[in-house]
Amino acid sequence: MATELGMGLAKKGHQIHFITYAQPTRLDFLSENLFYHEVSVKDYPLFDYPPYEIALAARMVDVVEFEKLDLLHVHYAIPHASAAILAKQILATKGITIPIITTLHGTDITLVGKEATYASVVTYAINQSDVVTAVSNSLKRDTHSLFDIQKEIKVIP
């Protein structure tokens, strides 16, 4: 869904930047308005798992600064929205304001979000986003029933 949205906006003349660890499979071409920025995740010997969320936030900061982006539109509350919130905070220390739109797709709420370990991060990421959208009314209801969400969630089916 995110890839198709980006490609459609690019056709209308908007510059679209995909920031992720792998080029989206549906993004089988790049054009003058479509860009892909790879997130390079390095192993950190102290930890068993690479710090993807930190690498993603750092890459978001770099791309926002270099490309002068107007906004970050992220898909999924974790890890993308939480990484975007961290990037926004880092950018604020540099005098850069970047709004965040978070689109909820389902598994970030109904599967990952139900894990008690992640609940506070999901709640924080959603509430700190400037705009929140969901792909269905049922997902909007589930989000409000599972988390203490203070933000309006707009449904875009």
Task: Give residue spans per PLM region.
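N-terminal subdomain of nucleotide-sugar transferases
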Residues: 1-25, 30-37, 67, 131
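Alpha-helix capping/helix-boundary segments
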Residues: 24, 79-80, 138-140
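An amphipathic, basic-hydrophobic alpha-helix
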Residues: 45-72, 81-82, 86, 116-120, ...
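Nucleotide-sugar donor phosphate/pyrophosphate-binding loop at the beta->alpha transition
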Residues: 91-101, 107-125, 141
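Proline-centered loop/turn at the N-terminus of a beta-strand
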Residues: 97-101, 131, 152
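A short beta-strand/loop micro-motif in the catalytic core of glycosyltransferases
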Residues: 128-136
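Helix-loop-beta element that forms the nucleotide-linked donor phosphate-binding surface
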Residues: 140-157
